[in-house]
Amino acid sequence: MDLKKHILNVKDFPIDGIDFKDVTPLLNDADAFAYVIDEMAKFVIECGANVVVAPEARGFLFASAVAYKSHTRFVLVRKPGKLPREVIDIEYTLEYGTNHQQMHKGDIKPGDKVVIIDDVLATGGTIEAIVKLVEMQEGKVEGVSFLIDLPALHDENLLQEYKVQKLVKY
């Protein structure tokens, strides 16, 4: 399936100079959405994962459906102040500053096999932070899956130590 037909490029959103990839048309097409979920779920099963992890917000849209389809647990990664129980936190560097990602302490069990799912792979900063959160709880990242890859924004060797799925490249 040509998924690019279901992803719109919105120029200068949310700020000038950014070409935003709008996935809402894909979500609004039952066949395209089902195709993405099926492909990601196959990848999760092939990786032997028992947990799917995803960051907010658009990662949740795909990962929750994939977790259901692959019959795995789903663990949320959120920005500070959004999770109600005790969290583990990681600070990571962005191009112009730092950011934090958090998950509930204990949601990843020692030995869990994890696939991380997100909508877009850009610089890789978020995904690298999530890998560290998983490893801090003695989980093992088996693979990473993305709907969209923006290879111009990251090193080609990024994530080479993992199985990687990228459904669309721009």
UniProtKB/Swiss-Prot annotation:
Q: Which UniProt keywords are given for this protein, alphabetically ordered? A: Cytoplasm, Glycosyltransferase, Purine salvage, Transferase
Task: List the GO terms this entry assigns under cellular component, sorted alphabetically.
Answer: cytoplasm
According to UniProt, this protein's pathway is: Purine metabolism; AMP biosynthesis via salvage pathway; AMP from adenine: step 1/1
Kindly list the organism's lineage. Answer: Bacteria, Bacillati, Mycoplasmatota, Mollicutes, Entomoplasmatales
Please give the catalytic activity noted in the UniProt record.
AMP + diphosphate = 5-phospho-alpha-D-ribose 1-diphosphate + adenine
Gene coding for it = apt
Write the protein's name: Adenine phosphoribosyltransferase
What is known about its subunit structure? Homodimer.
NCBIfam families assigned to the protein according to its UniProt record, in alphabetical order: apt (TIGR01090), PRK02304.1-3 (NF002634), PRK02304.1-5 (NF002636)
GO molecular function annotations of the record: adenine binding; adenine phosphoribosyltransferase activity; AMP binding
* Any one Pfam family match given in the protein's UniProt record, by short name: Pribosyltran
UniProt source species = Mesoplasma florum (strain ATCC 33453 / NBRC 100688 / NCTC 11704 / L1) (Acholeplasma florum)
